Curated annotation (Swiss-Prot):
Belongs to the PsbZ family. This is Photosystem II reaction center protein Z. The keyword Ligase does not apply. The gene is psbZ. Disulfide bonds: none annotated.
């Protein structure tokens, strides 16, 4: 179970980094928001699922 937690945490860190870099780039480009709105919302949804998954997996490890 520890390895599942570590993989989920690594995925959370990677998605967080991608969103921190990607969202300002999307807002800075002309027509970026209207063209990439779905990608941003998909990333945010994945981030939210990973936050809950890490919390649930953490309760099993400790």
């Amino acid at each position: 179970m520890t390895s599942v937690l570590q993989i989920a945490l690594l995925a959370l860190i990677a998605v967080s980094f991608a969103l921190v870099v990607g969202v300002p780039v999307v807002f800075a480009t002309p027509n970026g928001w209207s063209e990439n709105k779905g990608i941003v919302f998909s990333g945010l949804s994945l981030w939210l699922v990973l936050v809950f998954a890490v919390g649930i997996f953490n309760s099993f490890v400790i």
